[in-house]
Amino acid sequence: MEMEEVIAEVLQKIVPTEEERAFVKELIGELEGIAREKAQELGLEVKPYFVGSLAKDTYLAGDHDVDLFLAFPLDTPLEEVRERGLELGKEIGKTLGEYEIAYAEHPYVRAKYRDVKVDLVPCYDVRDWKDVRTAVDRSILHTKWVNENLNGKNNEVRLLKRFLKGIKAYGSEIYVRGFSGYLSEILVIKYGSFVEVLEKADFILRQKVVDPAGWLKREPEIAMKTVRREVEEDKPLVVIDPVDPRRNVAANLSWEKYGRFYFKADEFLQRPSLEFFFPTGKTGGDYLAELRRKGTHLITLLFDVPEMVDDLLFPQLERSARGFEKALSREGFEVLGWNTGRYGAEKAFVMLELDRVERPRVKIHPGPEFFTERGRDFYRKNERVWLVGKRLYAEKRVKENIIDVVRELLEKNQVALGKNLRETVKGAEILVDYVPRPLENEAYLFLSREKEGLKH
Amino acid sequence: MEMEEVIAEVLQKIVPTEEERAFVKELIGELEGIAREKAQELGLEVKPYFVGSLAKDTYLAGDHDVDLFLAFPLDTPLEEVRERGLELGKEIGKTLGEYEIAYAEHPYVRAKYRDVKVDLVPCYDVRDWKDVRTAVDRSILHTKWVNENLNGKNNEVRLLKRFLKGIKAYGSEIYVRGFSGYLSEILVIKYGSFVEVLEKADFILRQKVVDPAGWLKREPEIAMKTVRREVEEDKPLVVIDPVDPRRNVAANLSWEKYGRFYFKADEFLQRPSLEFFFPTGKTGGDYLAELRRKGTHLITLLFDVPEMVDDLLFPQLERSARGFEKALSREGFEVLGWNTGRYGAEKAFVMLELDRVERPRVKIHPGPEFFTERGRDFYRKNERVWLVGKRLYAEKRVKENIIDVVRELLEKNQVALGKNLRETVKGAEILVDYVPRPLENEAYLFLSREKEGLKH
């Protein structure tokens, strides 16, 4: 398939129809009206701003969640923005129908209206970066900057976003660490088009610093400080935020996600195909066959999770998996990989691929130097004891079976776990070389590396 | 048993009888006569010296090998000492009966006379340390110093030597690294008696430096240089040689052997027993039962060895065992311990205790950073490939069985082996959890840690 054909076909699927556009326009009109009305009723001098991909007209067809920011004058005390902003959000939410409170740096209202998710976020009405006081304040500036600079390349952004989603490199959530929508927009603005961004995958990485708004000239000291800080933290890219020289737009982009983009961009340019944008779901396979093929073992911990949003839960699951990896490797089990996720509404899982599930019944236990008080103690207390250099060693009986080892590690608090999971993981069900049916495909994707593999 | 009783009983066994003394005296007389005669015949101005425990009267009953040194005048060229010394040795050897050439720093003759081993070693007739030119030259000075300072404490030395033999801490050979006879003599001279040396096991270690001849006052610069050098090399003791301030008599003493002495001295003083001097041979046990108890595995390599003295062979066997330890641990097998030795007249063995003999069929293979030429290569060449940070990883198929792994490591020269063993080890027979009958007890002593264990 030719590049043009592929792109044309993708565009057909991702550019919103006139019908959808009309719906969105109407929606925005209604929401703005309601917001103004409610602000007035509460006697608040608040301006409603639409931000995000909807406001920038870079949303993908069918994906039109609304971000409505409620901007307070700069001289409003922060406490008032928090409280009265939430109050206003609730009032609007009530009018729209169902709503709930969500928590980020500050609480905000998440409502649903005409089947569309509407976030109502209090913020300051900032004019430039010097006014920024809360994390969300920049959004208004981002929207403004993109709209002023995109120059009709909205569909190029849509292509890039869809491509990044297809190759699993999209999303700036802390547990994804991929490309954000804003970063995609900046790259298109800077390099001209979807294809040009892809062609520059290697170049961009080598350049390292992207400065579309020329901050390095306008505010060299501040911008250089940003560059130095981010380079020191070994970030793959430093994209100086066009609206704030103190910020790296790509601060949360991981090397892994840039790597996916790096290889997939090249492959797509070599052999364009729809598959990159819309990967056909894996048919899956037999995880037990995969275990046999590799000669490895799978242990799965299933446990209840407290009510938590993914943003909070997923990093804690990962932290716990890493904790097991470290603790088990100290115990002589090699962890070849791990995988975590939700299991149903109230449970989560940690999967660990291990080199074995049994170990010797004895372990060599290094002791102190022999000529110390502790050395003489160690000598007295151990039956089989010997020296290597000046250090004493002894044979120590240990649990041999992986389940016993894991239970003991948990009992002795020797696994670093996510802080809200400490208690619940202790009561985990531990499965060896077996997962319940709903996790079979997950286990297969994990063990076969299709999940994180670059070639799938 | 009281200390006095034990000591009395030991002395009875280790002090030579009048009969033995008479035999030794006669032997020495004869040997001296023959040596003088042969030197004269060859027109050599050589003085015969008896050195070692026989000459110092510190030999253990029944253990009366002769060290006869053939001392050349200091103005003899080294080459002449080597050649004519060997010639003289051969002449004496012929007169005595059978003999062979042995190799140390210089070749010497090892003869047998009246069922006693007689070493005939060419050296210089040195007056003090400034004259020392070859490693053996000091022996004459050692003998002289001990005889001048021992003050009739010969049996105290015998007790200490027998004790050190009993606890397996005696012998200065490079593959033993224990206490030498000369070191035992110095300790008795310095601390007064066998029991006093034992009582000071901790004190001596803490003092670190023993200077019986007062070199630190007489030659402070040279002696301090010796102390600094040996302390830097982390030797357990620095015993400045009474006849040479440049030398640490305990240079070859290992921490392990001092550790044995340290604990056994204390135990003996607490509960004196003959067992320390004459350990009753272990009855041995079942090595297979030991493997089952520990849940570990034993692999044994049997291979031919070239004709080599123990001094050369044993360090090479140890080096090879360490080589396997390192190579196998890189391959994911934990080596809990190793053991080496001769097997019959022409073979040697390396035993390795392992945590397992099978591993997964796949290994995680770390590759280069993704954005390099090598990274793109790695990506192309591997099927299952993923990123951790900026580094690529791939799944690699590996041999799973220990025999295949060892064979492959040897084929690819990935095991550091003793230099004369490289070829022969490649043809080794590899046994898993089985040893031939003559090695069964050796395997048991190794696996049960009775061999190196401090408590046996």
UniProtKB/Swiss-Prot annotation, chains A, B:
Q: Which domain of life is it from?
A: Archaea
Q: Which Gene3D superfamilies match?
A: Archaeal tRNA CCA-adding enzyme catalytic domain (3.30.70.1550), Beta Polymerase, domain 2 (3.30.460.10), CCA tRNA nucleotidyltransferase, domain 2 (1.10.1410.30), Poly(A) polymerase predicted RNA binding domain (3.30.70.590)
Keyword Magnesium in the entry? The reply is yes
Q: What class of enzyme is it?
A: transferase
- Which co-factor is required? Mg(2+)
Biological process, per Gene Ontology: RNA repair; tRNA 3'-terminal CCA addition
Binding positions (CTP)? S53, K56, H142, K161, Y170
Residue positions annotated to bind Mg(2+) are D65, D67, D119
Q: Which UniProt keywords apply?
A: ATP-binding, Magnesium, Metal-binding, Nucleotide-binding, Nucleotidyltransferase, RNA repair, RNA-binding, Transferase, tRNA processing
The UniProt catalytic activity note for this protein reads: a tRNA precursor + 2 CTP + ATP = a tRNA with a 3' CCA end + 3 diphosphate; a tRNA with a 3' CCA end + 2 CTP + ATP = a tRNA with a 3' CCACCA end + 3 diphosphate
Q: Which GO terms describe its molecular function?
A: ATP binding; CCA tRNA nucleotidyltransferase activity; magnesium ion binding; tRNA binding
* Binding positions for ATP per the UniProt entry: S53, K56, H142, K161, Y170
Entry EC no(s): 2.7.7.72
Task: Fetch the InterPro entries from UniProt.
Answer: CAA_C, CCA-adding_arc, CCA_tRNA_nucleotrans_2, NT_2-5OAS_ClassI-CCAase, NT_sf, NuclTrfase_I-like_C, Polymerase_NTP_transf_dom, tRNA_NucTransf2
Presence of the UniProt keyword Metal-binding in the record:
yes
Its quaternary organisation is:
Homodimer.
Q: What does this protein do?
A: Catalyzes the addition and repair of the essential 3'-terminal CCA sequence in tRNAs without using a nucleic acid template. Adds these three nucleotides in the order of C, C, and A to the tRNA nucleotide-73, using CTP and ATP as substrates and producing inorganic pyrophosphate. tRNA 3'-terminal CCA addition is required both for tRNA processing and repair. Also involved in tRNA surveillance by mediating tandem CCA addition to generate a CCACCA at the 3' terminus of unstable tRNAs. While stable tRNAs receive only 3'-terminal CCA, unstable tRNAs are marked with CCACCA and rapidly degraded.
Q: What else is known?
A: A single active site specifically recognizes both ATP and CTP and is responsible for their addition.
Q: What is this protein called?
A: CCA-adding enzyme
State the organism named in the record. Answer: Thermococcus kodakarensis (strain ATCC BAA-918 / JCM 12380 / KOD1)
Gene from which this protein is expressed: cca
